[in-house]
Amino acid sequence: MYLKQNLMSYLAQAIGELKSQIHAYLQQSTNELVRFQVKLDKVDLLAWLKGQSAYPQFYLHFRDEEKALAALGAVQSFSQLNLAQEFIEESGFPLVGGLQFQGTAQFVLPKMLVEQDNKGTLVSFFVKNEQSANDTLAHLKTFENLTALSALPKQIPLHTELRANERTWCDWVNQALVEIKSGELTKIVLANETTFHLKQAINAYDFLAESEKQNQGCYHFLWAENSHSVFVGSTPERLFAREYNLLLTEALAGTASVSESEEETQSQANWLLNDEKNLKENWLVVEDISQNLRKQVESFDVSNVELKPLRKVQHLIRKIRANLTAHYADVNILKAIHPTAAVSGLPQQQAKMILSEIETFDRGWYAGTLGVMSDVCSEFCVAIRSAFIEGHRIRVFAGAGIVAGSQPLEEWKEIERKAAGLISLFAEEK
């Protein structure tokens, strides 16, 4: 166990402030939903979450700025997007959560929301009655007992199960190419699931902390509804970020390898920037997003194609900037662009139907979207490069976009490289 040296003094002051706020609230004898806020010194959010026993748990470390948030528990839950949007507009309070790949929604107003940036740490407590008001003091004291993060041990998996081995994967790709050739599809994104059975259980918080160190330039996320299955990942892809009516989104598609040789990596980068298939695959995503947002934006600007370098792979990326119409709503943006052609295909509904016929597993949260939604600003990542950690078992996902001209074996190599970003954190090669 460890504690930052000056955290105790911050906690003592914060508890005193909170007691005063709670006393004033209780004097009003109301069941109105309210927010209490206190400031703390910087806290290791993953270490804090690791020591908590309440669920659900949510964590998001943002990609493009030094900002992170963690959420614990649920005061209210929403499975209907429209009700979630109405709640935000009426209360002004934020929600965390997202959509699974197939569109199942889950958003919560947490009991505790911890927001952290380079200015400090702000803790919000959402309460709606006397009992929950009194509970906030106990919740605040949980910062006294941070559970130290541990180094992630490398181990040789006892057993590995591939949802699709190389041969089956090539069959899947060939099925997809038949659909593309027939004109049913322009693009489809196939995914694979690999399950590792381990001698030593993996702690999801230690795993994500290690991924934060090694997989830079990514969003790092965690979503857990219970202690038995924790969804984590380090994704390079933004679904969208909104501040007032300014919308930022992107097309991230097209992949090449990264090697230990700088010369080979640069050669792959040059090839990627000039490869017709990959450039087309990326542009299809741009067209899909622009088409789906056309009724919600007043202007739409697309950057030139760039490289997005990562530890194991590099991608093509085009950044998109749009001004929303006066009557924008985050839920309408979510409905319009999730899932994008970067994780599903084109046309979207046809691609999703064919994926359900080819793939032999339920994606669940994989290739879904997770984030935070509020009245002023919202941000969501695309939940790829992800895994379910389930004690002695970890299920890792990776996908590849299939278009006319795709080669099955090359696509197999691509998903192996993508999955390696997480697998290399815990698995030793035999």
From Swiss-Prot:
A single GO BP: L-tryptophan biosynthetic process
Keyword terms: Isomerase, Magnesium, Menaquinone biosynthesis, Metal-binding
InterPro entries xrefs: ADC_synthase (IPR005801), Chorismate_C (IPR015890), IsoChor_synthase (IPR004561), MenF (IPR034681), MenF-like (IPR044250)
Enzyme Commission no: 5.4.4.2
A GO molecular function held by the record: magnesium ion binding
Keyword Magnesium: yes
UniProt family annotation: Belongs to the isochorismate synthase family.
Function: Catalyzes the conversion of chorismate to isochorismate.
Name of the protein: Isochorismate synthase MenF
Species in which this protein is naturally found: Haemophilus influenzae (strain ATCC 51907 / DSM 11121 / KW20 / Rd)
Lineage of the organism: Bacteria, Pseudomonadati, Pseudomonadota, Gammaproteobacteria, Pasteurellales
Gene: menF
